């Protein structure tokens, strides 16, 4: 358990600086078709990509709560991007609401936050909210999912200029919680994931980005944390299930409707 806590601590603190242990990364994967994921958001600090996010409402982006360990005045949300150096549509953050039961490092439980834009998005080909799941959504072990991010393409590298995507499979949570893997660190709302190849993995600040699972274009998970070594097969990346939090999301976003 001590080793797991140490890994989580390194990763979450790494989110404080781009390019450190919890920057943004997809190792492997492929470039997405431009604007085929119009719900993607880039949370940026002083113009540099920090974490992913997903537009779930014309005024709100969902991300990982630990991504907000920053001075809010330095943060912006950028929508409609394919390449990081393109202009996109930039918003100030009017309000940031972490889940009321969020537990920071080492637990990282309920690792979700809602960010209110200082304007309202008009849905278009390049910017469009992603549908929330039903409160009863179940994503079973073996389910195929995909995620996207602007991350490093190899350990210790630079951010990708273009949005890349990676196919993943949901793993059995009991297995992920055994002593060879996360050793009891995972809460019931967490799920771990694996790519088709051991040389591929999301990691380092792709946190906050959405996982879309199954055939429907519906949000299923938000990436939370991983290991210092992104492709460590015994510390697979972990995401937070969205379905248990749908009531909270609707309550918060409904205030601005």
Curated annotation (Swiss-Prot):
Keyword Hydrolase: yes
Paired cysteines (S-S): 51-67, 145-213, 176-192, 203-230
Gene3D superfamilies noted in UniProt: Trypsin-like serine proteases
Propeptide: 24-25
Signal peptide residue numbers: 1-23
CDD domains linked: Tryp_SPc (cd00190)
Record: glycosylation sites: 177
Keywords: Apoptosis, Cytolysis, Disulfide bond, Glycoprotein, Hydrolase, Immunity, Innate immunity, Protease, Secreted, Serine protease, Signal, Zymogen
Broadest EC class assigned to this enzyme: hydrolase
Expression sites (tissue/organ): Highly and constitutively expressed in activated natural killer (NK) cells.
Alphabetical GO biological process terms: apoptotic process; innate immune response; killing of cells of another organism; protein maturation; proteolysis; T cell mediated cytotoxicity
Enzyme Commission number, as recorded: 3.4.21.-
GO cellular component: extracellular space; membrane
Molecular function terms from GO: serine-type endopeptidase activity; serine-type peptidase activity
Ranges for domain Peptidase S1: 26-254
Location relative to the cell: Secreted; Cytoplasmic granule
Active site location: 66 (charge relay system), 111 (charge relay system), 207 (charge relay system)
Chain's role: Cleaves peptide substrates after methionine, leucine, and norleucine. Physiological substrates include EZR, alpha-tubulins and the apoptosis inhibitor BIRC5/Survivin. Promotes caspase activation and subsequent apoptosis of target cells.
Family statement drawn from the similarity comment of this UniProt entry: Belongs to the peptidase S1 family. Granzyme subfamily.
The protein's name: Granzyme M
Organism, scientific name: Homo sapiens (Human)
Gene: GZMM
